[in-house]
Curated annotation (Swiss-Prot):
Protein name: Arginine--tRNA ligase
GO cellular component: cytoplasm
Primary localization: cytoplasm
Assembly and binders: Monomer.
Catalytic activity: tRNA(Arg) + L-arginine + ATP = L-arginyl-tRNA(Arg) + AMP + diphosphate
Gene3D superfamilies, alphabetized: Arginyl tRNA synthetase N-terminal domain (3.30.1360.70), HUPs (3.40.50.620), Isoleucyl-tRNA Synthetase, Domain 1 (1.10.730.10)
Length: 562
């Protein structure tokens, strides 16, 4: 039981007016450690008990059983709890040493399936830093949910269908050359895509041709299909190379095209329930009762839209995986689309539509400007990762020129730096892409956390220390206490990150833990012979375990030496 739950239970025994959960949510952490470790504000009881909060705090502090605390005291309208440092540090260190990487593991999910719709790059377009967010946020959410006992199923919903393929086919037939494309597929296809978009602005006829070619593709025309398959195969070679560098893998590559033969069922259900209405030759579903505009299901030319395919996708996933959560990690600009999708599925009678969650995220910009594939204004991810690794290697060679496996460590640090920087940003916020800031060993960065972990491993090697599960390690100084409280809160942070679908909670926790350890390291002579030496080393060991596991949840490696 974590200390906040323990305190909430003890307060509930003397405050029947509030339930344990309400009390738990009211508990605060004082800004000044002199005011205790946990505080309960008595304001909420003033109306009920018809007394001043200060008086209530004083009376309750007297009634609470203080035997398991260092002390309990009222300060103004607050009841302040000072925890027993020695006994809690003993419990926490014992738990981490015993459970190791399983520390913080929970069984909330009990093997239930969570599907993650993620990454979803567009075929025939370069993999840019814009795709990074969906990829790494969803991968981290997958690790976090697995830590809670769920079975995380990662699905790459490739952008391999849509009018853009009509555009690309028209561009290729007008200006393309097979040998040129095969020599450098993504770059050449991007040139064609940018050119057709620019020319279509001046010549709307090209747009119409693109629509016709996409309709041919939907109807199974051989020439259209062969070109599409070729574009797809060439693109996947590059994508898989990048996923290997990112150390991200998928359980399924089900692109939009996978659902082409699965859309009729959804449309049939809409027809059977008389939900389809005609509007200007197109077919729509009225969503007025959800305060949403009508959902366009089929265009007047019979071509389907994203929502039609996403209906089929959701139905397939529910039937195949029986998910308890179907999570879509997709940018904020798709928010309206997912509201409509959920509403249409609800109208179709699928209660599981409530389990569909759109996890949105903010934009990545460069010099505060939006990136756009259509305008050719993008940052390619692969050369960016290579540059990050190169910068990491330069810093490693300066710090530790004799390090073995320098290239492997540089890869872990460089790629980890890019991922960590993305993940430490509050999910709903965007960020400006700054490689220099990402790869810095100072500040709130991935390399800073990795370097702290490697520093601890160096201390443990010097001391030749391996903790003993039977030894009662405990500490009661202020510096170690800050670390102990963080270690104790690891499981609660994992739960909160899952509840909010936000890995930045884990990234910020890792930064805070690394900072607390480095303060401890600066003020404590860990290796000096003393009664507390082994307990201090046990604290180092426990910190390293939790730092490494925090990084793993984010999909970032923790090198043993740097």
């Amino acid at each position: 039981m974590d200390t906040k739950t323990l305190i909430a239970n003890d307060i509930a025994k003397v405050v029947p007016e509030l339930d344990q959960e309400t009390i738990y949510n009211l508990l605060e952490t004082p800004k000044n450690s002199d005011m205790g470790d946990v505080a309960f504000p008595a304001f909420s009881l003033a109306k009920v008990l018809r007394k001043a909060p200060q008086m209530i705090a004083g009376e309750l502090a007297e009634k609470i059983d203080a035997a398991q605390y260092e002390k309990v005291m009222a300060v103004g309208p607050y009841i302040n709890f000072f925890l027993d440092k020695s006994s809690i540090s003993k419990e926490v260190l014992e738990a981490v040493i015993k459970e190791k990487a399983n520390y913080g593991q929970q069984h909330i999910g009990d093997g239930q399936n969570v599907t993650l719709d993620m990454s979803s790059p567009n075929i025939a377009k370069p993999f840019s830093v814009g795709h990074l967010r969906s990829t790494v946020i969803a991968d981290a959410i997958g690790h976090i949910y697995s830590k809670l006992g769920y079975n995380s199923i990662r699905i790459n919903h490739l952008g391999d269908w849509g009018k853009q393929f009509g555009m690309l086919i028209v561009a290729y037939k007008l200006w393309g050359d097979r040998a040129t494309v095969e020599a450098n597929p993504i770059d050449e296809l991007l040139k064609l895509y940018v050119r057709i978009n620019a020319e279509a602005e001046e010549n709307p006829e090209l747009d119409e041709q693109a629509r016709q070619w996409f309709k041919k593709l939907e109807d199974g025309d051989k020439e259209a299909w062969d070109l599409w398959q070729w574009f797809r195969d060439e693109s996947l070679v590059e994508f898989n190379r990048i996923y290997d560098k990112l150390d991200v893998s998928f359980d399924h590559f089900h692109g939009e095209a996978f659902y082409n033969d699965k859309m009729d069922e959804g449309i049939q259900i809409l027809e059977d329930k008389n939900l389809l209405k005609e509007s200007k030759g197109a077919q729509i579903v009225d969503l007025e009762k959800y305060n949403l505009p009508p959902a366009l299901i089929k265009k007047s030319d019979g071509a389907t839209l994203y929502i039609t395919r996403d209906m089929a996708t959701a139905m397939y996933r529910q039937r195949t995986f029986n998910f308890v959560k179907n999570i879509y990690v997709v940018g904020q600009e798709q928010s309206h689309h997912f509201k409509q999708l959920k509403a249409v599925l609800k109208e179709m009678g699928f209660d599981w539509s409530d389990d569909m969650i759109h996890v949105s995220f903010g934009l990545v910009t460069k010099n505060k400007k939006k990136l756009s594939t259509r305008k050719g204004n993008i940052i390619r991810l692969e050369p960016t990762l290579d540059e990050a690794v190169s910068r990491a290697l330069t810093q490693i060679e300066a710090k530790n020129p004799d390090l073995e496996n320098k290239e492997d460590v540089a890869h872990a640090v460089g790629v980890g730096a890019v991922k960590f920087y993305d993940l430490k940003t509050d999910r709903d916020n965007g960020y400006d892409f700054d490689l220099e800031a990402m790869v810095s060993f100072e500040g709130e960065t991935g390399p800073y956390v990795q370097y702290t972990y490697a520093r601890i491993q160096s201390i443990l090697r010097k001391a030749d220390f391996t903790p003993n599960e039977e030894t009662p390690y405990s500490l009661n100084d202020a510096e170690s206490w800050e670390i102990i409280k963080l270690l104790q809160g690891f499981a609660a942070n994992i739960e909160r990150a899952a509840e909010k679908y936000d890995p930045s909670i884990i990234a910020k926790f890792a930064i805070q833990l690394a900072q607390s350890f480095n303060r401890y390291y600066a003020h404590t002579r860990i290796l000096d012979e003393s009664e507390e030496r082994d307990s201090r080393l046990a604290l180092c060991y426990a910190t390293a375990v939790v730092l490494k596991e925090s990084l793993r949840l984010l999909g970032v490696q923790a090198p043993e030496k740097m």
